Amino acid sequence: MSENRLKIGITQGDPNGIGWEVILKTFADPRMTELCTPVIYGSLKAAEFYQKTIADLEPVPFHIASSIHEIRRGKINLILCGDETKIEPGTASPEAGRAAAEALHAAVRDLRDEQLDALVTAPIDKESIQSDDFRYTGHTEFLAAELGGEPLMMMCSDLLRMGLVTIHIPVTEISHDLTRQKIVTRLEQLRSSLKADFGIVEPRIAVLALNPHAGDGGLLGSEEEHIIRPAVNEAYEKGILAFGPVSYTHLTLP
């Protein structure tokens, strides 16, 4: 196995949420360190609490580090953040929100300094994390503000790769936020990601409609004809194999 394993930052998320359970169950398999060098940002107190309370869990040996410069290859590294937080599973609190934000800020600093190759974020509680240092509706917006660039949120399964045009806004605002240029930009981003990250030589992208039955020719909404279809046509002219709008009720998987 190459010594040049990717360094993957992992934030604990809300210490009262599911993040630590997912992290511990993932790294209970010792083979994980053969694939990457994990760097977890979080509370040792929380890690030890969940190690004791989760049934049938193999012990996870952590290498404790105070900074990214103390991590070791082949080890499950834990950079200490928010260790004074009171652990109350399932309970939202400002204290837990601060611990989640502290881990996230520390990881993003190291990512920005090119000390990490990628970042995985455990879930946060979007209400309790709000503070003067964190005024965002989610990880996506925070990372965009800290690292620059236009974010693309994707949802992935074994069969499906789905990019979102709008993110983290009320349903009542979607039609106002939807523009032809935004759709074209998202299609360009999605095509680039599918090629670079998923190895798809030339992806074909179905663009889903906003309204039921793709608007039924304007009877159920005009966004398909006035915004979505022109955007799809423009993207196709740019060499993107996009088609639609397709009614989401017609979306089928192999």
Q: Residue ranges of each PLM-predicted region?
A:
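A generic structural signal for well-ordered coil/turn residues at beta-strand boundaries
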Residues: R72, E150, L159-R161, V201
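Active-site glycine-rich loop that binds ribose-phosphate moieties when present
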Residues: F142-A145, G149, V171-S193
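A glycine/threonine-rich phosphate-anchoring loop and its flanking beta-alpha core
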Residues: M153-L178
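Short, acidic/small-residue loops that bind anionic groups at enzyme active sites
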Residues: S131-S157
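Contiguous, glycine/small-aliphatic-enriched amphipathic segments in soluble metabolic enzymes
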Residues: M1-G138, Q181-L251
